Structures are given as structure tokens and as C-alpha cells.
A protein has these predicted regions:
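SAM/dcSAM-binding transferase cores
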Residues: 22, 43, 111-128
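Extended basic-aromatic, gly/pro-enriched interface segments that bind polyanionic ligands
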Residues: 1-47, 51-57, 86
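Conserved beta-strand signature within the Rossmann-like core of class I S-adenosyl-L-methionine
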Residues: 74-82
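A short glycine-rich, Lys/Arg-flanked "PGG" loop and its adjoining helix->strand segment in the class I
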Residues: 61-74
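Conserved Class I S-adenosyl-L-methionine
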Residues: 1-20, 85, 89-116
Length: 128
């Protein structure tokens, strides 16, 4: 990583580097078991490198992939490992600038409306 990025983005704490607090504001870091848990919110960016598409069986890869794209906002990004491949073609997803491991969910107005309605239902059910 370029030295400038390290200086601007991280604080050194002993031998470790921590993301500066100004960059953590408004960001939610979640550690979950992809095989069973599904986040309840929508994401702009999902980083899933060298886990699901490397070690899971193909049926489970498809299930996890579907869950990820369901929870990804329209125009959001999924980044997988450089040596990984998605197990299936996803119609609403394109490879970003020809990068085989960076994907963008393309969703027009209909997709955005579906996601908005889904968020509304989730919010209402949480209040019940």
C-alpha cells in the first residue's frame, strides 16, 4: 500500500495498523457466518474474499451469492478474491471495468422500488 494511503488512513498502534476513526464513521463492520446468517440491512459494498467462493460447495456458493446480491443496494459493489469466480451468472450484475472480481449491481428504478418496499416491510415488522 502506498505510504501516503497508510499515513492518511491508518493509525499505528504498536505493530498493528487501525483504520482512523474519521474513516470508520458511518461504516458498519459486520462479522457473520455466511452459511446461515443474513444481515437485515442493505449495503453499498460487500467484501467477501477467499471464503465463500473458494471453500464452500457449489450449491452453498449459489445460495450465499443470492443472499449477498439481495442485500446489495442498486449500484452497490461486491468484491471477491482475485482468483475467485461467481458460481453463476447474475443478470443484474456487471463486472466493473472488466475486473473479474469486482462486480456492480445494476438495477434500474424497478429494482430500487423492490428494495425500498422490502426495507419498508422490514422496518414495519421491527416495530410490531
Amino acid at each position: 500500500m502506498p505510504r501516503l494511503f497508510i499515513e492518511e488512513g491508518f493509525d499505528q498502534v504498536g505493530p498493528l495498523y487501525c483504520v482512523k476513526s474519521k474513516h470508520r464513521e458511518g461504516v458498519e463492520f459486520i462479522n457473520q457466518d455466511l452459511r446461515s446468517e443474513v444481515p437485515t440491512c442493505l449495503f453499498d459494498l460487500i467484501l467477501c474474499r477467499y471464503v465463500a467462493f473458494t471453500y464452500f460447495a457449489s450449491a452453498l456458493q449459489c445460495k450465499v451469492m443470492a443472499r449477498m446480491f439481495e442485500r446489495l443496494r442498486p449500484n452497490g459493489y461486491l468484491v471477491i478474491g482475485a482468483d475467485e469466480k461467481l458460481p453463476a451468472i447474475v443478470p443484474e450484475v456487471v463486472s466493473l471495468n472488466g475486473q473479474p472480481h469486482i462486480f456492480q449491481k445494476i438495477g434500474g428504478l424497478q429494482s430500487a422500488k423492490r428494495n425500498f418496499r422490502r426495507e419498508q416491510r422490514t422496518s414495519i415488522s421491527l416495530l410490531d
